[in-house]
């Protein structure tokens, strides 16, 4: 049986790092599917899914399939079935599969596809997602891209599958900026780097001659703000990723640390260290370079992070003794403490969904990554150990990335964990790595 094109819709995707991708929606089933994943019910049994090698004239089809499978498996929501168990060999991805062959191996969803080279040198990637027990096609799309951009196509396909089966946006077509750490501990070289969310395509964006820390993406993904010790004193800089151009964010007399963009990208919030040892939170409007002081305490106020709607800011302050989490209006009004547990809290970051705040907690000799509701209730620790720090949210608010350093020799490594705390994965990087920051979805 052939599945014809029911509806065609072209969309164009641009990226600062990739060529144009055009996508066409070719077929969808009714809105209610037999197979779906309810990601709001707590602990979830991963969905068995069969992902066949995409037909191609070379190894590229298999490579794309491997990236898709790895993305979905790493989310903890999917269990890709071993290809050795497949009964049917897909020879025509345009035709409906033999659903009974896939039901026998309990493949509740099936992905088929094809990669072909076009006369202009571009690649055409097609895929279809099937509900095997419902006997229907759920989604079908095709993409055009340059050969060197094949990994991004794989991530986009994985996002489409994730969204169709969970109802939530995926997070695979994203990047992470982080601090790459190389060399011996006494002479550690720290460079800013960018990679795909799965650790591939690492690119360095600083040379390591000056210590650089706390990189953070702008909402449009075109800029990074970070702290550099160039000249011996920490200052906040703004780096244009496409051109490499950078500029100082505010020529303050003291040290500036912990920068982060506002949700609209028009401001940077940061902390300014005072001569008396205190630190207060300031914003700089990037349009006119005006600064506004938000806190005026004798304490250390730092680690500010906006709510997704830009109306509130969460930050760390030791004004009550130990470092705790506080929330205030974006104009500095009505500061109130929200963390009430034992220990010290730091590195708060607001979820893109607006419902949770992630943080680092130090208590009883351990560092934990946790989340709480925005009023401080419902605190949950997701992972604990010798040193876990610096959570950053995936753009769908379902997964966190952080860095961990084990006791003894060695250095920090990057990990992801979901909100159940059960699905923890290491992200492979060329060297030691710390202080990650997740980008929004690419476009």
Swiss-Prot record:
Belongs to the TolB family. One of its GO terms (biological process) is protein import. One of its GO terms (cellular component) is periplasmic space. The keyword Signal applies. Gene3D superfamilies: TolB, C-terminal domain, TolB, N-terminal domain. Keywords: Cell cycle, Cell division, Periplasm, Signal. The Tol-Pal system is composed of five core proteins: the inner membrane proteins TolA, TolQ and TolR, the periplasmic protein TolB and the outer membrane protein Pal. They form a network linking the inner and outer membranes and the peptidoglycan layer. It holds the Pfam family PD40. It comes from the Bacteria. Its main location: periplasm. Part of the Tol-Pal system, which plays a role in outer membrane invagination during cell division and is important for maintaining outer membrane integrity. It is found in: Periplasm. This is Tol-Pal system protein TolB. Residues 1-33 form the signal peptide.
């Amino acid at each position: 049986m052939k599945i014809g094109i029911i509806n065609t819709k072209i969309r164009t995707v641009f990226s600062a790092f990739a060529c144009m991708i055009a996508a066409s929606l070719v077929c969808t089933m009714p809105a209610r599917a037999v197979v779906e994943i309810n990601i709001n019910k707590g602990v979830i049994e991963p969905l068995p899914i069969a992902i066949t090698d995409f037909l191609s004239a070379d190894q590229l089809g298999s490579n794309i399939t491997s990236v898709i499978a790895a993305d979905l498996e790493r989310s903890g929501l999917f269990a890709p079935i071993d290809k050795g168990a497949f009964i049917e060999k897909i020879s025509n991805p345009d035709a409906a599969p033999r659903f009974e062959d896939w039901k026998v191996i309990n493949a509740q969803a099936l992905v088929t596809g094809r990669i072909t080279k076009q006369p202009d040198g571009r690649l055409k990637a097609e895929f279809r997602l099937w509900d095997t027990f419902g006997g229907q096609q759920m989604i079908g799309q095709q993409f055009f891209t340059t050969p060197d951009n094949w990994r991004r196509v794989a991530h986009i396909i994985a996002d489409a599958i994730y969204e169709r089966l969970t109802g939530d946006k995926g997070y695979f077509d994203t990047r992470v900026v982080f601090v790459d750490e190389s060399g011996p501990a006494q002479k550690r070289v720290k460079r800013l780097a960018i990679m795909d969310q799965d650790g591939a395509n690492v690119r360095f964006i600083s040379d390591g001659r000056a210590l650089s820390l706390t990189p953070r993406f702008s909402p449009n993904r075109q800029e990074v703000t970070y702290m550099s010790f160039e000249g011996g004193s920490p200052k906040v800089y703004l780096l244009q990723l496409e051109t490499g151009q950078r500029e100082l964010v505010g020529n303050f007399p003291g040290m500036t640390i912990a920068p982060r963009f506002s949700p609209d990208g028009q401001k940077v919030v940061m902390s300014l260290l005072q001569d008396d040892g205190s630190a207060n939170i300031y914003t700089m409007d990037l349009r006119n370079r005006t600064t506004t002081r938000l806190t005026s305490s004798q304490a250390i106020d730092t680690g500010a992070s906006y709510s997704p709607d830009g109306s509130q800011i969460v930050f760390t302050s030791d004004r009550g003794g130990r470092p705790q989490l506080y929330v205030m209006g974006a104009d500095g009004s009505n500061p109130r403490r929200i963390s009430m547990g034992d220990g010290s809290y730091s590195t708060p970051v607001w979820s893109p969904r607006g419902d949770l705040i992630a943080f680092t907690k130090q208590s009883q000799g351990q560092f934990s990554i946790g989340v709480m509701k925005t009023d401080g209730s419902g605190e949950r620790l997701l992972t604990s150990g010798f040193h876990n720090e610096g959570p950053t949210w995936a753009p769908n608010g379902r997964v966190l990335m952080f860095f961990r350093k084990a006791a003894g020799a060695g250095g920090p490594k990057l990990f992801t964990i979901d909100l159940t705390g059960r699905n923890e994965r290491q992200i492979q990087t060329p060297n030691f790595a710390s202080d990650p920051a997740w980008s929004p979805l690419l476009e």
